[in-house]
Protein backbone atom coordinates (compact mmCIF):
# COMPACT_ATOMS: atom_id res chain seq x y z
CA UNK A 1 0.00 0.00 0.00
CA UNK A 2 1.25 3.48 -0.84
CA UNK A 3 1.86 5.87 1.97
CA UNK A 4 0.58 9.43 2.26
CA UNK A 5 3.09 11.36 0.10
CA UNK A 6 5.86 13.24 1.85
CA UNK A 7 6.90 15.93 -0.67
CA UNK A 8 6.97 19.56 0.42
CA UNK A 9 3.72 20.27 -1.42
CA UNK A 10 1.98 17.25 0.04
CA UNK A 11 3.12 18.15 3.55
CA UNK A 12 1.49 21.55 3.12
CA UNK A 13 -1.67 19.85 1.93
CA UNK A 14 -1.62 17.48 4.91
CA UNK A 15 -1.21 20.42 7.25
CA UNK A 16 -4.30 22.02 5.69
CA UNK A 17 -6.18 18.73 5.92
CA UNK A 18 -5.33 18.32 9.60
CA UNK A 19 -6.57 21.85 10.27
CA UNK A 20 -9.87 21.13 8.49
CA UNK A 21 -10.33 17.84 10.32
CA UNK A 22 -9.81 19.62 13.63
CA UNK A 23 -12.36 22.30 12.73
CA UNK A 24 -15.00 20.33 10.84
CA UNK A 25 -17.31 19.62 13.79
CA UNK A 26 -17.75 23.36 14.34
CA UNK A 27 -20.29 25.46 12.47
CA UNK A 28 -22.29 22.51 11.12
CA UNK A 29 -26.09 22.03 11.00
CA UNK A 30 -27.79 20.38 13.96
CA UNK A 31 -28.60 16.83 12.87
CA UNK A 32 -31.66 16.69 15.15
CA UNK A 33 -33.03 19.83 13.48
CA UNK A 34 -32.47 18.39 10.01
CA UNK A 35 -34.31 15.21 11.02
CA UNK A 36 -37.31 17.27 12.10
CA UNK A 37 -37.39 18.88 8.66
CA UNK A 38 -37.14 15.46 6.99
CA UNK A 39 -40.06 14.12 9.04
CA UNK A 40 -42.32 17.15 8.48
CA UNK A 41 -45.46 16.75 6.37
CA UNK A 42 -45.94 19.04 3.39
CA UNK A 43 -48.97 21.01 4.60
CA UNK A 44 -47.82 24.45 3.47
CA UNK A 45 -47.19 25.59 7.03
CA UNK A 46 -43.95 23.81 7.94
CA UNK A 47 -40.51 23.56 6.43
CA UNK A 48 -39.99 20.27 4.59
CA UNK A 49 -37.07 18.50 2.95
CA UNK A 50 -38.63 19.09 -0.47
CA UNK A 51 -38.85 22.86 0.08
CA UNK A 52 -35.30 23.00 1.39
CA UNK A 53 -34.01 21.05 -1.61
CA UNK A 54 -35.82 23.33 -4.06
CA UNK A 55 -34.31 26.36 -2.35
CA UNK A 56 -30.79 24.91 -2.64
CA UNK A 57 -31.38 24.27 -6.34
CA UNK A 58 -32.35 27.93 -6.71
CA UNK A 59 -29.12 28.94 -4.96
CA UNK A 60 -27.17 26.71 -7.33
CA UNK A 61 -28.89 28.41 -10.27
CA UNK A 62 -27.83 31.79 -8.89
CA UNK A 63 -24.28 30.54 -8.40
CA UNK A 64 -24.17 29.49 -12.05
CA UNK A 65 -25.81 32.71 -13.21
CA UNK A 66 -23.23 34.94 -11.54
CA UNK A 67 -20.30 32.61 -12.18
CA UNK A 68 -19.49 32.30 -8.49
CA UNK A 69 -17.16 29.67 -7.07
CA UNK A 70 -18.45 26.32 -5.82
CA UNK A 71 -17.09 27.16 -2.38
CA UNK A 72 -19.46 30.15 -2.27
CA UNK A 73 -22.38 27.84 -3.02
CA UNK A 74 -21.12 25.34 -0.42
CA UNK A 75 -20.96 28.01 2.26
CA UNK A 76 -24.44 29.31 1.34
CA UNK A 77 -25.85 25.79 1.79
CA UNK A 78 -24.02 25.44 5.10
CA UNK A 79 -25.47 28.71 6.39
CA UNK A 80 -28.96 27.81 5.19
CA UNK A 81 -28.92 24.39 6.84
CA UNK A 82 -27.44 25.74 10.06
CA UNK A 83 -30.26 28.27 10.24
CA UNK A 84 -33.04 25.85 9.24
CA UNK A 85 -31.82 23.26 11.76
CA UNK A 86 -32.14 25.82 14.56
CA UNK A 87 -35.22 27.83 13.62
CA UNK A 88 -38.83 27.03 12.69
CA UNK A 89 -38.99 28.78 9.33
CA UNK A 90 -42.32 29.21 7.59
CA UNK A 91 -42.26 28.31 3.88
CA UNK A 92 -43.24 31.86 2.91
CA UNK A 93 -40.02 33.17 4.47
CA UNK A 94 -37.71 30.54 2.95
CA UNK A 95 -36.83 32.61 -0.12
CA UNK A 96 -35.66 35.53 1.98
CA UNK A 97 -33.69 33.23 4.30
CA UNK A 98 -32.04 31.43 1.40
CA UNK A 99 -31.09 34.61 -0.44
CA UNK A 100 -29.72 36.13 2.78
CA UNK A 101 -27.49 33.09 3.32
CA UNK A 102 -26.38 33.25 -0.30
CA UNK A 103 -25.56 36.97 -0.06
CA UNK A 104 -23.59 36.44 3.16
CA UNK A 105 -21.56 33.71 1.47
CA UNK A 106 -20.96 35.88 -1.60
CA UNK A 107 -19.78 38.85 0.45
CA UNK A 108 -17.58 36.56 2.55
CA UNK A 109 -15.79 34.75 -0.29
CA UNK A 110 -16.12 36.57 -3.61
CA UNK A 111 -14.04 39.54 -4.72
CA UNK A 112 -15.72 42.82 -3.83
CA UNK A 113 -15.98 43.89 -7.47
CA UNK A 114 -18.02 40.76 -8.23
CA UNK A 115 -20.55 41.20 -5.41
CA UNK A 116 -23.90 42.23 -6.93
CA UNK A 117 -26.07 44.97 -5.52
CA UNK A 118 -28.82 43.68 -3.26
CA UNK A 119 -31.44 45.23 -5.56
CA UNK A 120 -30.06 43.33 -8.55
CA UNK A 121 -29.87 40.09 -6.60
CA UNK A 122 -33.50 40.35 -5.49
CA UNK A 123 -34.72 41.25 -8.97
CA UNK A 124 -32.84 38.44 -10.68
CA UNK A 125 -34.09 36.01 -8.03
CA UNK A 126 -37.68 37.12 -8.84
CA UNK A 127 -38.59 37.81 -5.22
CA UNK A 128 -40.91 40.56 -4.05
CA UNK A 129 -39.32 41.44 -0.74
CA UNK A 130 -37.27 44.61 -0.33
CA UNK A 131 -33.61 45.31 0.32
CA UNK A 132 -34.58 46.23 3.88
CA UNK A 133 -36.22 42.82 4.28
CA UNK A 134 -33.05 41.15 3.01
CA UNK A 135 -30.82 43.15 5.36
CA UNK A 136 -33.05 42.38 8.35
CA UNK A 137 -32.99 38.69 7.53
CA UNK A 138 -29.20 38.79 7.14
CA UNK A 139 -28.91 40.13 10.67
CA UNK A 140 -31.23 37.41 12.00
CA UNK A 141 -29.21 34.71 10.24
CA UNK A 142 -25.95 36.13 11.60
CA UNK A 143 -27.32 36.18 15.13
CA UNK A 144 -28.53 32.57 14.91
CA UNK A 145 -25.19 31.31 13.56
CA UNK A 146 -23.43 33.32 16.28
CA UNK A 147 -21.81 35.61 13.67
CA UNK A 148 -19.68 32.69 12.49
CA UNK A 149 -20.05 32.87 8.72
CA UNK A 150 -17.00 30.85 7.70
CA UNK A 151 -17.32 27.08 8.00
CA UNK A 152 -15.59 23.88 6.94
CA UNK A 153 -17.32 22.43 3.88
CA UNK A 154 -17.26 19.19 1.93
CA UNK A 155 -15.94 21.13 -1.07
CA UNK A 156 -12.81 22.10 0.86
CA UNK A 157 -12.22 18.44 1.70
CA UNK A 158 -12.92 17.44 -1.90
CA UNK A 159 -10.21 19.84 -3.10
CA UNK A 160 -7.66 18.64 -0.56
CA UNK A 161 -8.35 14.93 -0.99
CA UNK A 162 -8.12 15.31 -4.76
CA UNK A 163 -4.84 17.24 -4.54
CA UNK A 164 -3.32 14.67 -2.19
CA UNK A 165 -4.35 11.82 -4.47
CA UNK A 166 -2.79 13.64 -7.41
CA UNK A 167 0.46 13.95 -5.45
CA UNK A 168 0.48 10.19 -4.90
CA UNK A 169 0.24 9.36 -8.62
CA UNK A 170 2.91 9.31 -11.32
CA UNK A 171 2.69 12.43 -13.48
CA UNK A 172 1.35 10.54 -16.50
CA UNK A 173 -1.57 9.14 -14.45
CA UNK A 174 -2.79 12.40 -12.99
CA UNK A 175 -5.61 12.86 -15.48
CA UNK A 176 -7.38 9.69 -14.43
CA UNK A 177 -9.49 11.42 -11.76
CA UNK A 178 -11.63 14.28 -13.12
CA UNK A 179 -12.13 17.04 -10.54
CA UNK A 180 -14.87 18.75 -12.57
CA UNK A 181 -16.87 15.54 -12.43
CA UNK A 182 -16.35 15.19 -8.67
CA UNK A 183 -17.39 18.82 -8.18
CA UNK A 184 -20.58 18.31 -10.18
CA UNK A 185 -21.40 15.22 -8.13
CA UNK A 186 -20.97 17.16 -4.89
CA UNK A 187 -23.32 19.88 -6.16
CA UNK A 188 -25.93 17.22 -6.85
CA UNK A 189 -25.54 15.89 -3.29
CA UNK A 190 -25.90 19.38 -1.81
CA UNK A 191 -29.39 19.48 -3.35
CA UNK A 192 -30.48 16.68 -0.99
CA UNK A 193 -30.91 17.53 2.68
CA UNK A 194 -29.84 14.06 3.78
CA UNK A 195 -26.22 14.82 2.87
CA UNK A 196 -26.15 17.76 5.27
CA UNK A 197 -26.21 15.15 8.04
CA UNK A 198 -22.89 13.71 6.85
CA UNK A 199 -19.57 15.01 8.12
CA UNK A 200 -18.00 17.11 5.34
CA UNK A 201 -14.92 14.87 5.21
CA UNK A 202 -17.03 11.73 4.92
CA UNK A 203 -19.22 13.14 2.15
CA UNK A 204 -16.20 14.29 0.14
CA UNK A 205 -14.35 11.00 0.48
CA UNK A 206 -17.53 9.02 -0.29
CA UNK A 207 -17.83 10.81 -3.63
CA UNK A 208 -14.15 10.25 -4.44
CA UNK A 209 -14.15 6.59 -3.32
CA UNK A 210 -17.24 5.87 -5.41
CA UNK A 211 -15.59 7.39 -8.46
CA UNK A 212 -12.39 5.43 -7.85
CA UNK A 213 -14.40 2.20 -7.68
CA UNK A 214 -15.77 2.94 -11.15
CA UNK A 215 -12.28 3.74 -12.47
CA UNK A 216 -10.85 0.48 -11.05
CA UNK A 217 -7.51 2.17 -10.37
CA UNK A 218 -5.49 0.31 -7.73
CA UNK A 219 -3.17 3.23 -6.98
CA UNK A 220 -6.08 5.61 -6.42
CA UNK A 221 -7.90 3.03 -4.28
CA UNK A 222 -4.81 2.66 -2.08
CA UNK A 223 -4.49 6.44 -1.84
CA UNK A 224 -8.15 6.80 -0.82
CA UNK A 225 -7.66 4.13 1.85
CA UNK A 226 -4.70 6.08 3.24
CA UNK A 227 -6.81 9.24 3.34
CA UNK A 228 -9.62 7.35 5.08
CA UNK A 229 -7.25 6.16 7.80
CA UNK A 230 -5.61 9.56 8.14
CA UNK A 231 -9.03 11.20 8.49
CA UNK A 232 -10.16 8.50 10.96
CA UNK A 233 -13.26 7.73 8.92
CA UNK A 234 -15.08 4.55 9.93
CA UNK A 235 -15.38 2.01 7.10
CA UNK A 236 -19.08 1.41 7.77
CA UNK A 237 -19.79 5.14 7.68
CA UNK A 238 -17.96 5.48 4.39
CA UNK A 239 -19.87 2.56 2.85
CA UNK A 240 -23.20 3.91 4.14
CA UNK A 241 -22.68 7.33 2.57
CA UNK A 242 -21.21 5.88 -0.62
CA UNK A 243 -24.43 3.95 -1.16
CA UNK A 244 -26.52 7.08 -0.62
CA UNK A 245 -24.29 9.08 -2.98
CA UNK A 246 -24.62 6.36 -5.62
CA UNK A 247 -28.41 6.40 -5.32
CA UNK A 248 -28.49 10.20 -5.50
CA UNK A 249 -26.31 10.35 -8.61
CA UNK A 250 -28.37 7.65 -10.33
CA UNK A 251 -31.54 9.66 -9.71
CA UNK A 252 -29.81 12.90 -10.68
CA UNK A 253 -28.81 11.51 -14.07
CA UNK A 254 -32.37 10.31 -14.75
CA UNK A 255 -35.16 12.42 -16.21
CA UNK A 256 -37.11 12.10 -12.95
CA UNK A 257 -34.79 14.47 -11.11
CA UNK A 258 -35.60 18.18 -11.14
CA UNK A 259 -32.32 19.93 -11.92
CA UNK A 260 -31.46 23.57 -11.22
CA UNK A 261 -32.41 25.82 -14.12
CA UNK A 262 -30.45 28.98 -14.85
CA UNK A 263 -32.32 29.61 -18.10
CA UNK A 264 -35.38 30.90 -16.25
CA UNK A 265 -33.25 33.63 -14.70
CA UNK A 266 -32.17 35.25 -17.94
CA UNK A 267 -35.67 36.07 -19.16
CA UNK A 268 -36.47 38.36 -16.25
CA UNK A 269 -33.48 40.64 -16.81
CA UNK A 270 -34.75 43.56 -18.88
CA UNK A 271 -32.57 45.34 -21.40
CA UNK A 272 -32.16 48.31 -19.09
CA UNK A 273 -31.23 46.11 -16.15
CA UNK A 274 -28.77 44.17 -18.31
CA UNK A 275 -27.06 47.41 -19.32
CA UNK A 276 -26.83 48.50 -15.68
CA UNK A 277 -25.42 45.21 -14.45
CA UNK A 278 -21.70 44.64 -14.58
CA UNK A 279 -20.69 42.57 -17.60
CA UNK A 280 -19.61 39.66 -15.42
CA UNK A 281 -23.10 39.46 -13.90
CA UNK A 282 -24.69 38.63 -17.22
CA UNK A 283 -22.84 35.51 -18.18
CA UNK A 284 -25.57 32.91 -18.54
CA UNK A 285 -24.14 29.42 -18.22
CA UNK A 286 -26.09 26.21 -18.48
CA UNK A 287 -25.72 23.89 -15.51
CA UNK A 288 -23.47 21.19 -16.94
CA UNK A 289 -24.29 17.55 -16.66
CA UNK A 290 -21.81 15.47 -14.70
CA UNK A 291 -18.90 14.88 -17.12
CA UNK A 292 -18.42 11.38 -18.47
CA UNK A 293 -15.52 9.32 -17.18
CA UNK A 294 -12.54 9.06 -19.48
CA UNK A 295 -11.74 5.38 -20.07
UniProtKB/Swiss-Prot annotation:
UniProt keyword annotation of Cell membrane present: no
* Identification of the protein by name: Cyclin-G1
Q: Its function?
A: May play a role in growth regulation. Is associated with G2/M phase arrest in response to DNA damage. May be an intermediate by which p53 mediates its role as an inhibitor of cellular proliferation.
Keyword set for this entry?
Cell cycle, Cell division, Cyclin, Mitosis, Nucleus
* Any Gene Ontology biological process: cell division
Q: Where are the transmembrane segments?
A: none
UniProt-annotated location(s): Nucleus
